[in-house]
Regions:
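Short linear sequence motif anchored by a di-proline
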Residues: 1-106
Length: 106
């Protein structure tokens, strides 16, 4: 997952949410689990290390990593995300979006 993304919709998953064009780790984000929708802090910590605060994982190694073995699945709503490219000493953000408007989450 990217390090910054956009939620410009006011009620994703029927939750009251203040739109942001710069959602960053540790902010509250709207998610949908199998049974309900809720706002949670964007980060992930395994049960055995509460202060790990991960924000992404590789799908191809997720099943083998001890950090993610007990993780529950969710859907994260978004309107788009940023990927950064370096040009010399400068980092330039490029905005991307997709039709699905959802990330897979843990």
């Amino acid at each position: 997952m990217c390090g910054r993304f956009v939620i410009s919709s006011k009620n994703p998953f029927d939750l009251e949410y203040t739109p942001s064009y710069n959602v960053t780790p540790s902010q509250l984000i709207p998610i949908k689990t199998k049974h309900r929708s809720k706002l949670i802090k964007w980060s992930y910590s395994p049960l055995w290390k509460k202060d790990m605060n991960l924000i992404n994982c590789r799908s191809e190694s997720m099943k083998e990593k001890p950090s993610f073995k007990e993780a529950k699945r969710c859907i994260i709503f978004h309107d788009g995300w940023y990927e950064w490219q370096r040009k010399g000493k400068e980092k330039i953000p490029f905005y991307h979006s997709s039709k699905s408007k959802n990330f897979a989450g843990l």
